[in-house]
């Protein structure tokens, strides 16, 4: 299918879900009842749901069929071994623990690694710092709940929507090593490499940067955890943008990437395409003691280590989804859909982050310059977009970043972004055109959009359940 300007979706739609159309008055009332928080809206009141791509997309026919093979044995399920074999084949990792989703893995490995560093290296919990190219919100939350200070060490181009860079998700390697030396390597229990880097706009990390980061980690004997929700999209960007790997397959790039970490934690609801599921996996016997301790915690918090909160059919589906999510034509279509949306928005004067994976990221700070960061311009924009068109999106800015747990002050956010997250194989190009038209209407009324303030503010992960009002 070469030399066509636009290729259609590379799949056939067999099952559909009807959606409800609502009026502007209905939506105005709904968002007020939800406390200006789109997480608190009912899904039936959403026309196009761009809140997340996590477990919200379609599954393939092979994934659905695989569920019929499910072995529901409490322990030693053959479905577990199907999943563990898929992990070994794709990532090269020897030890696998299934979890119900990514945060299930986080609540297990984070306290174990902190305890190990404390026992073996004399970690001082009052000085404990963990590093990432940018922590996902729940990874940050679990780290803080366990007493760690989080530091995101990203390159200067990462959040600059006026600058293009092939790998905006990269670590600032100099800042990483300086930070380790500043706090003392013994006080750093782990480094997290997030691929793709969600908070920077679904931006990829290059293989060269992964290698260099891992060399620094080895130098100071710090374990590296690959936050792997969008591993396949990251591999696709490496193939397309890093010349050394242009002739490599997605499978080859993925396998190579995971040489530069010691463990992986995954929300499988993204690139593995399942509606529920997660993984915690360890590369080899150098992490066997951590693996054994995590297995013990898994029994208490998730379930027996050969099911981890997942039914047998779900593990079979995940084993297939890991492979299906790496298809070359699928990834090319998915990334081109994001590019189409970003290009359409920029044509009408809506500034966006350079197209990455899984979402278009609108620069709300530039669209609403009259709203200061402490009044959450991206959240205000999200509310207006819902009122205008029934589209649910999500703020990636000051509201999500939250407060310094020690001082209570709002943490400075590098950019106020609105994420338009595209669920897999769910929306067509016509939907993208509708989103662009909706933004045209929002832009026309931008100067009248008001900032927001709290009426209820949770102390941790506040963006999920906070309630706000217009100022």
From Swiss-Prot:
Keywords (A to Z) from UniProt: Lyase, Pyridoxal phosphate, Tryptophan catabolism
Pfam assignment, any one: Beta_elim_lyase
EC number: 4.1.99.1
Cofactor (UniProt): pyridoxal 5'-phosphate
GO MF annotations in UniProt: tryptophanase activity
Pathway: Amino-acid degradation; L-tryptophan degradation via pyruvate pathway; indole and pyruvate from L-tryptophan: step 1/1
The UniProt record lists the keyword Phosphoprotein: no
Keyword Coiled coil: no
InterPro entries membership: ArAA_b-elim_lyase/Thr_aldolase (IPR001597), Beta-eliminating_lyase (IPR011166), PyrdxlP-dep_Trfase (IPR015424), PyrdxlP-dep_Trfase_major (IPR015421), PyrdxlP-dep_Trfase_small (IPR015422), TNase (IPR013440), Tryptophanase_CS (IPR018176)
Catalysed reaction, written as an equation: L-tryptophan + H2O = indole + pyruvate + NH4(+)
Annotated positions of the N6-(pyridoxal phosphate)lysine modification: 270
Superkingdom of this protein's organism: Bacteria
Subunit structure: Homotetramer.
UniProt similarity note: Belongs to the beta-eliminating lyase family.
NCBIfam families: PRK13238.1, tnaA_trp_ase
Full protein name: Tryptophanase
Source organism of this protein record: Histophilus somni (strain 129Pt)
Source species taxonomy: Bacteria, Pseudomonadati, Pseudomonadota, Gammaproteobacteria, Pasteurellales
UniProt gene name: tnaA
């Amino acid at each position: 299918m070469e030399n066509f300007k636009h290729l259609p979706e590379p799949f056939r739609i067999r099952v559909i879900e009807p959606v409800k159309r609502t009026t502007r008055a209905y939506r105005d009332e709904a968002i007020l009842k939800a406390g200006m928080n789109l997480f608190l809206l009912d899904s039936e009141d959403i026309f196009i749901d761009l809140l997340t791509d996590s477990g919200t997309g379609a599954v393939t026919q092979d994934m659905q069929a695989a569920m019929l093979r499910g072995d529901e044995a409490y322990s030693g399920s053959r479905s577990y071994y199907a999943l563990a074999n898929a992990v070994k084949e794709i990532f090269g990792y020897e030890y696998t623990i299934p979890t119900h989703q990514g945060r299930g893995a986080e609540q297990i490995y984070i306290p174990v690694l902190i305890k190990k560093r404390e026992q073996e290296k004399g970690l001082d919990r009052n000085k404990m710092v963990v590093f990432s190219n940018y922590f996902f919100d729940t990874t940050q939350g679990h780290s803080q709940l366990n007493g760690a200070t989080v530091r995101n060490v990203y390159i200067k181009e990462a959040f600059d929507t006026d600058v293009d860079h092939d790998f905006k998700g990269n670590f600032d390697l100099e800042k990483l090593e300086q930070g380790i030396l500043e706090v003392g390597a013994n006080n750093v229990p782990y480094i997290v490499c997030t691929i793709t880097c969600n908070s920077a706009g679904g931006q990829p990390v290059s293989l060269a940067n992964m290698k260099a980061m891992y060399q620094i980690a080895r130098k100071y004997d710090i374990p590296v955890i690959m936050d792997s929700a969008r591993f396949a999209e990251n591999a696709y960007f490496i193939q397309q943008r890093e010349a050394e790997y242009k002739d490599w397959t997605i499978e080859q790039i993925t396998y190579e990437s995971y040489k530069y970490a010691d463990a992986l934690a995954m929300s499988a609801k993204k690139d593995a395409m399942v509606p529920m599921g997660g993984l915690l996996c360890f590369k080899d016997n150098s992490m066997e003691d951590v693996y054994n301790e995590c297995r013990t915690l898994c029994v208490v918090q998730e379930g027996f280590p050969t099911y981890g909160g997942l039914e047998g059919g779900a593990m079979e589906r995940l084993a297939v989804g890991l492979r299906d999510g790496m298809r070359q034509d699928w990834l090319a279509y998915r990334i081109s859909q994001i590019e189409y949306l970003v290009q359409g928005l920029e044509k009408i004067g809506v500034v966006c982050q350079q197209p990455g994976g899984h979402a278009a990221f609108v620069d709300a700070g530039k669209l609403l310059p009259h709203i200061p960061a402490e009044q959450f311009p991206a959240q205000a924009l999200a509310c207006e977009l819902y009122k205008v068109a029934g589209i649910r999106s999500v703020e990636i800015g000051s509201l999500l970043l939250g407060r310094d747990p020690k001082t209570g002050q709002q943490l400075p956010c590098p950019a106020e972004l609105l994420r338009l997250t595209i669920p897999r194989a769910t929306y067509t190009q016509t939907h993208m055109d509708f989103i662009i038209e909706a933004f045209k209407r929002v832009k026309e009324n931008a100067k009248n959009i008001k900032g927001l303030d709290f009426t209820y503010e949770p102390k941790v992960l506040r963006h999920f359940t906070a309630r706000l009002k217009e100022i």
